[in-house]
């Protein structure tokens, strides 16, 4: 099965199953993150504005959806969810969901019940938090990633520039922000599939008119960071992905396109000669079909088939 789920701004989700098939409507609203159960392509988790979350299932040709947003206890501070609140499925168990508000929540039963596994991982400055319905909440989580190698090794990043790691499934968290640019929006955190101590972070400062690209790598769980932005032209970095077949190949999406590095981030090349200069929001690599799916803002979905040509450049 080759499937893509995407959303259209101020509209709904769309999905297709194979290249030759037309797009079909899927449930959703003002779309942000979504995840497909890898064991059941008819089960889709989709988030919406301010961290709302639902699970949708296709049965007998009909979609049914259930709100599964976690709740806080009586007397606890209200939840703060970014417009793009992060939701991921565990690579070790598709029934395990992680959802980021100002806390990290975990469900082990497809969203039926939730456990809060962190404290507030943001700066939580009341003077700048913002309050609905007058402002989009600030001091919220924006990125989550669990190691494909080790269950419970989880990273979280926030819109105010903080990054944390837990190595024990949320029992203890360690801040690993030192060495990263201060107070920048964490657009993506990616735990490596090749080495459990390696993690990548992209940040951007477009919200304060900083158009630099911030791309960092750590090989010691975030204790120290190295700048791997290389020769990418200035432009906020939105996403980074490892190649699933060749260690050292990295793909980066920025406000102006897609770049590939064949040497672990030392140098980059433009990828996709006919791809228009546009905001690239996400990148996904289909592991079986070896295609790169590029999600843009305003220019649709693009694919680059047969990444072998890129992978063969690395011995």
Named regions from a protein language model:
Residues 1-315:
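Beta-propeller blade termini and top-face loops
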């Amino acid at each position: 099965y080759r499937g893509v789920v995407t959303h259209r701004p101020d509209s709904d989700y769309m999905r297709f199953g194979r290249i030759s098939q037309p797009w079909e409507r899927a449930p959703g609203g003002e779309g942000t993150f979504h995840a497909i159960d890898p064991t059941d392509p008819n089960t889709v988790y989709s988030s919406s504005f301010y961290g709302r979350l639902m699970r949708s299932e296709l049965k007998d040709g009909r979609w049914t959806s259930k709100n599964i947003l976690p709740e806080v206890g009586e007397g606890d501070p209200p939840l703060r969810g970014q417009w793009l609140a992060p939701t991921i499925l565990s690579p070790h168990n598709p029934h395990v969901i992680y959802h980021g508000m100002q806390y990290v929540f975990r469900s082990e039963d497809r969203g039926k019940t939730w456990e809060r596994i962190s404290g507030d991982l943001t700066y939580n400055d009341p003077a700048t938090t913002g309050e609905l319905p007058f402002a989009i909440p600030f001091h919220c989580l924006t990125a989550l990633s669990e190691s494909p190698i080790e269950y419970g090794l989880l990273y979280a990043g926030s819109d105010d520039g903080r990054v944390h790691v837990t190595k024990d499934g949320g029992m203890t968290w360690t801040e690993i922000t030192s060495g990263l640019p201060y107070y920048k929006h964490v657009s993506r955190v990616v735990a490596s599939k090749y080495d459990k101590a390696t993690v990548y972070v992209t940040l951007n400062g477009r919200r304060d008119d900083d158009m630099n690209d911030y791309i960092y790598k750590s090989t010691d769980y975030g204790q120290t960071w190295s700048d791997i932005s290389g020769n990418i032209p200035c432009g906020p970095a939105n996403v980074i992905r490892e190649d699933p077949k060749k260690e050292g190949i990295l793909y980066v999406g920025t406000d102006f396109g897609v770049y590939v590095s064949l040497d672990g981030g030392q140098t980059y090349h433009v990828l996709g000669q006919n791809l228009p200069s546009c905001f690239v929001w996400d990148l996904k690599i289909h592991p079986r079909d070896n295609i790169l799916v590029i999600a843009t803002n305003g220019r649709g979905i693009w694919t680059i088939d047969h990444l072998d040509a890129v992978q063969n450049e690395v011995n």
